[in-house]
Amino acid sequence: MFVEVSGTTPMLIGCATCHNPHGSDSTAELREPISTRDTTNLCIRCHMRNAAPDTANTRGPHSPQGPTLLGRSGWLPPGFVWDSTDVPTHANAAANPRLCVTCHMDTLNVNAAGGTLAWHYTGHGFYAAPCVDTAGVDSTDACDVSVRSFAACSASGCHASGGAARANFQAIEQEMAFLTGTLWTDVNGDGKIGSGDTGLLTQVPATEFKRDSIITAAEGALFNVQLVAVDGSHGVHNPPYLRALLTATIQAVKQKYGLSVPPAQAARLARLAAGLGRGVALR
């Protein structure tokens, strides 16, 4: 749902949100193109809010999916340089010309136990890995990853099978959980750094979170942890970028506040830093 700038009534996202009933120059009468890698992209026009920290806004990231896909989101630690032209497949206009739509609008036939067609999913739920059963696609999107359909990943030709894509997803999800957890795990889920929580940010003085005209390393790191959570893809939108960004963020927090992590964590972080590859500079 959304609310117009000049209004107060929540509006449902419907056909006319993306399609122009009066016609357009784009495919399927879309309001904007789907292949552009900037803010003129149909999906990114909305999914681009509060993708970087701003001293005028204390609510953190809002809908940062577009800039994250393009490698342009988050707080950039001192010395961190990312070559945004070195893009992974998901954001590569040549390898994936339909960008968001390839994953989020794949069609799917759901068969009954006997193999007959029970439901045809048109992709307009926008689930990249939908929950499916013989009744159709579960709109709660709350099922376990083991029963989600990763058919879009194999149909695109990017992954050998849905099972292979699922395994990749789980590996990326675990890696992001390790990196964000090294910075902060909100154990009680209250959205605040407090007693009982874990991670480097729990060891930083509270004065570093003043929310004034200066974005401290601690505030930037907190933003990046929130970025991964709010993005909602568990890191899949841009694994190389988020991996590099979080690794650099951890280094920045450790250096700024003189902190350390247990040896096992340090060894894993060192392996990640060594494998970041081209497109990244940590100075």
Residue spans of the language-model regions?
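C-type cytochrome heme-c attachment and multiheme electron-transfer modules
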Residues: 1-283
